[in-house]
Amino acid sequence: MPTYRSATTTHGRNMAGARALWRATGVKEDDFGKPIIAVVNSFTQFVPGHVHLKDMGQLVAGEIEKAGGIAKEFNTIAVDDGIAMGHGGMLYSLPSRELIADSVEYMVNAHCADAMVCISNCDKITPGMMMAAMRLNIPVIFVSGGPMEAGKTKLSDQIIKLDLVDAMIQGADPTVSDAQSEQIERSACPTCGSCSGMFTANSMNCLTEALGLSQPGNGSMLATHADREQLFINAGKRIVELTKRYYEQDDESALPRNIADRAAFENAMALDIAMGGSSNTVLHLLASAQEGEIDFDMGDIDEMSRRVPHLCKVAPSTPKYHMEDVHRAGGVMAILGELDRAGLLNNQTKTVLGLTMQEQLAQYDIMQTEDEEILKFFRAGPAGIRTTKAFSQDCRWDRLDDDRKEGCIRTKENAFSQEGGLAVLSGNIAVDGCIVKTAGVDEENLKFQGPAIVFESQDSAVEGILGGKVKAGEVVVIRYEGPKGGPGMQEMLYPTTYLKSMGLGKACALLTDGRFSGGTSGLSIGHASPEAASGGTIGLVNDGDIITIDIPSRSITLDVPESELQARRAKQDELGWKPVNRQREVSFALKAYASMATSADKGAVRDKSKLEG
């Protein structure tokens, strides 16, 4: 029978000092012996996805204490990728994931907490906490802050839906008037919550449902809706049950590695492919699997991308649907239900509710259940009122979107495409693979060939695009922006946005060893591995070299003879794999990150071999 970890600090005469300090935090005499549960919050006023989380920790804590636990809250950092984007701040985004994972480990292990409730929301916070959860392997439940409502504005006598990416594109488009750009900017992000499309934050929060680590609705219920409060309340109650199951009943099925096992990671990736999620999710799933010592790699993702169809199309891949529409169509449980009916789901995986996924779908898939409360839950909709407050409205759609032929979520037979929304490409320019979000690629661009125009940084690429150096038909190559070379693997949303604003969005391809925002669409290929700084072939590309992209064949090729590549490699080995004439200040903290960073095909995690004796 496992012993409560917290007993290390609460039992025995030699722990008198620790107990004295616990008492100073409010622990009462009869509390000693109860499980100590860490409430891992990420409230910050810097990030709209987290600005409403201030009171959420105490809401969860209250339920933990009612259920017989001791709740102790702490906060992690949280970087807003949108605000950090387009300048040196983006260098810090991906490295913050490792800091978050480490800080959770530090706090939980230093104080011997027995379990965790992770209150996350945005891009690197959910992955960082997930890495920590898989690393620590103590009972955990995730509950996120929820998606933002889609923005709305009236243009040309039509009401249109908006999101952050619309504001960015219009702001860079020289044909858009200042007045129209400002109108869109003011309407794009109306409420608290994670940005309203299927960007990285919402993709990751959806994946926690598929992994079994969060409750149904976690990924899709709006941040502003009153129904979301119940997810926090239930998380507080449920974590105490999970904790007691493990420590008092020796039930290891309550542990995250036994819930989010390999089969669950396959489910999460299947969901990601089916919903056309952010390509960043590949990084984070690979990293989390490694933390959980689960054998799951790019080969698995490649295999799944060939057989899982694209069942749900959401902004930025279409302006028609946002997260509020996904929820109306039944949310993650509805997509998983369609995958299950198509024979593409491992339905015997476990969940934090103590059910198998099959049992959970029977209760929560709107195409199966007749439970009126569940159906009402998925009719929760937006209010259209600007606010930074959680649970501030109780609006409902008149009816659910259960149209599986032409609606937001579709059956396999009526899929947006029979191949999924993400694909792994490989070839001599990326021998360990690269990622493209096929959900955002127009059909005429699935095959593309053109001459390279090479930039040594995102900054120079932006300058080149806006300065008219990039021409239709070219492949824009941005290198030395990988985990090590950046360092920090910046998102390339501005280059892709500016290509669109310059009328080149469908006329050019973009290849990088950096990554893309979940808001990116178009023929944008990232995560080229190995990265340039690690000797990847992307570092050998010259202006004018022909690059051939064939998504149906999953290939990407630099059309240069091998003998020429070998000669270039020998020369580059002498020069060192560094960008030419790039002016960038790199702090000691970022240099420390770069010194251990692996390429994207490994999840951009730290190279553990450098620590092994």
Swiss-Prot record:
GO cellular component: a single term: cytosol
Cofactor note: Binds 1 [2Fe-2S] cluster per subunit. This cluster acts as a Lewis acid cofactor.
Pathway where this protein functions: Amino-acid biosynthesis; L-isoleucine biosynthesis; L-isoleucine from 2-oxobutanoate: step 3/4; Amino-acid biosynthesis; L-valine biosynthesis; L-valine from pyruvate: step 3/4
Gene Ontology molecular function terms on file: 2 iron, 2 sulfur cluster binding; dihydroxy-acid dehydratase activity; magnesium ion binding
Assembly, per entry: Homodimer.
Family annotation (NCBIfam families): ilvD, PRK12448.1
PANTHER family with a match to the protein in the record: D-XYLONATE DEHYDRATASE (PTHR43661), D-XYLONATE DEHYDRATASE YAGF-RELATED (PTHR43661:SF3)
Protein name: Dihydroxy-acid dehydratase
Higher taxonomy: Bacteria, Pseudomonadati, Pseudomonadota, Gammaproteobacteria, Vibrionales
